[in-house]
Design a protein with these regions (language model features):
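Exported/periplasmic ABC-transporter solute-binding proteins
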Residues: 1-87, 93-103, 108-280
Length: 280
């Protein structure tokens, strides 16, 4: 399914010669949240109108599997989970992982929830099961329904490494593990007891690909997750979207050429115009 996003890459730079043709463009894959980035890059680097660019992503875990199995040349993803790193090791594949754009990990609640800010410790307590009621963190007397994501999804890997940092997460109830970014947003947004749900995802996805009026992003430790706060590092639950290739790609390979184009000045301009936070 195609996802429509509000920050579209629309204008090709007429002063910029295409680097690739549609025929020799490397086979790319990636996560849901990097699909617009991949489309923007392919449009810019081939000199093709965005509506004529066909890119499909098979989501984070499958993208890693495809790269390891040489079914794709470059993937745009979050950092590999321990399981994905082990898969590569078992296959004798060394991964080259390069940050392309900045990203932040964000938490959201229904707009009717009175809470606007949580500390990182409070979030850890909620997801470890230590805190179970909103009144314990300054909200109303309602049980917290803390949504999780499936293992090996980009969001779950981010939650474990960036937020929990070794603290064991409580076992999720099966109905609270959303199967995709869209699912987790829908459940938090439309849950009947509107004050009691919390979810998490990546900033770009929530603000650009899934702008849904019924949710609000929470400040963490008093800092709002805004574009500027992410770019400056003030909002510090940060990661990146990475371009990953097999390390044995030759210097003159198209995969390596594409990677270098993504982190070039022009590549970063393309990323910014597509709504992502520049890394360089």
């Amino acid at each position: 399914a195609y996802l429509y996003f509000t920050h579209a890459w629309e204008k090709k730079d007429k002063n910029q010669d295409p680097i690739f043709t549609m025929e020799n463009y490397p086979k790319i894959d990636g996560s849901t949240a990097t699909l617009p980035l991949a489309q923007a890059y392919k449009s810019a680097f081939t000199g093709t109108d965005i509506e004529n660019v066909d890119v499909t992503h098979s989501k984070t875990h499958n993208a890693y599997v495809n790269l390891i199995n040489k079914k794709s040349d470059l993937i745009l993803v979050t950092y590999p989970s321990e399981e994905e790193q082990q898969l590569a090791k078992d296959a004798g594949v060394e991964l080259e992982i390069v940050p392309v754009v900045k990203e932040a990990f964000v938490f959201f609640v229904n707009k009717e929830n009175s809470i606007d800010n949580l500390t990182l410790n409070q979030i850890q307590d909620i997801y470890s099961g230590k805190v179970t009621n909103w009144k314990e963190v300054g909200g109303t007397d309602a049980q917290i329904l803390a949504y999780q994501r499936p293992q090996n999804s980009g969001s779950q890997s981010g939650m474990l490494s960036l937020v929990m940092q070794g603290i064991k997460m409580k076992e999720p109830e099966k109905e609270t593990v959303a199967q995709s970014m869209v699912d987790i947003v829908d459940v938090v947004s439309d849950y009947q007891n509107k004050e009691n749900a919390i979810g998490y995802s990546y900033y770009y996805y929530i603000t650009t690909m899934y702008s849904k009026g019924k949710i609000k992003l929470l400040s963490v430790n008093g800092i709002e997750p805004t574009y500027d706060n992410i770019k400056t590092g003030l909002y510090n639950i940060q990661t990146a979207y990475y371009a990953v290739i097999r390390k044995d790609e030759p210097e003159n390979s198209n995969a390596r050429k594409l990677l270098n184009a993504m982190i070039s000045t022009y590549g970063q301009k393309v990323a910014k115009e597509a709504g992502y936070v520049q890394n360089y």
